[in-house]
Curated annotation (Swiss-Prot):
Enzyme class, first EC level, given as a word: translocase
Name listed for the protein in its UniProt record: NADH-ubiquinone oxidoreductase chain 6
UniProt main location, coarse: mitochondrion
Encoding gene (name): MT-ND6
Role, per record: Core subunit of the mitochondrial membrane respiratory chain NADH dehydrogenase (Complex I) that is believed to belong to the minimal assembly required for catalysis. Complex I functions in the transfer of electrons from NADH to the respiratory chain. The immediate electron acceptor for the enzyme is believed to be ubiquinone.
Catalytic reactions on record: a ubiquinone + NADH + 5 H(+)(in) = a ubiquinol + NAD(+) + 4 H(+)(out)
Lineage of the organism: Eukaryota, Metazoa, Chordata, Craniata, Vertebrata
Listed transmembrane segments: 1-21, 23-43, 47-67, 86-106, 133-153
Gene Ontology CC terms: mitochondrial membrane
Length: 167
């Protein structure tokens, strides 16, 4: 239970890091930490295979996207975490999270154990279910993501040579 609280706090910090967005480099780091912590929370709930697959797919997609993103929008002097502008964004987002917690979650009953909440869901998530019912959709989703990547890269190239060029 303590590890879930630590993961939740780390996930919240990574979301604030992405929302403050000082530079594409730091936002990519915040997303990677958020993906890792989110998959760690799934692993604590007993969904080890699903968390591993989500982690690999998400980080693979982010690797491709953030390899091209800094190249397309490179800044000579990016804002770092120590700048006052980024610090003010972090303070505003933390204030909004605290207000939302007091307004919406303050009166809710917290679960004593993770098993109370995710115990019934564990049996439906497994290797056989992912590949039996959703195998074709995983394949189609992979192709759609590849085509979307190629379309975006071709649209953003302008009049220069694009990503689909003869070598």
């Amino acid at each position: 239970m303590v590890l879930m609280v630590v993961f939740s706090v780390m996930f919240l910090i990574s979301l604030i890091a992405v929302a403050s967005n000082p530079s594409p480099y730091f936002a990519a780091f915040g997303l990677m930490v958020g993906a890792g912590v989110g998959c760690g929370m799934l692993m604590q709930c007993g969904m080890t295979f699903l968390s591993m697959i989500l982690f690999l797919i998400y980080l693979g997609g982010m690797l491709v996207v953030f390899a091209y993103s800094p190249a397309l929008a490179a800044e000579p002097y990016p804002n770092a975490w120590g700048s006052w502008e980024v610090f003010s964004y972090v303070l505003v987002y933390m204030f909004l999270v605290i207000v939302a917690w007091v307004a919406f979650v303050g009166d809710m009953e917290l679960f004593d154990d993770v098993e109370e909440y995710f115990g019934a869901m564990r049996r439906y998530v497994g290797v056989a279910e992912v590949y039996n019912a959703g195998g074709y959709m995983l394949f189609i989703a992979g192709w759609v993501l590849l085509m979307a990547l190629l379309v975006v890269l071709e649209l953003t190239r302008g009049y220069s040579r694009g990503c689909l060029r003869a070598v």
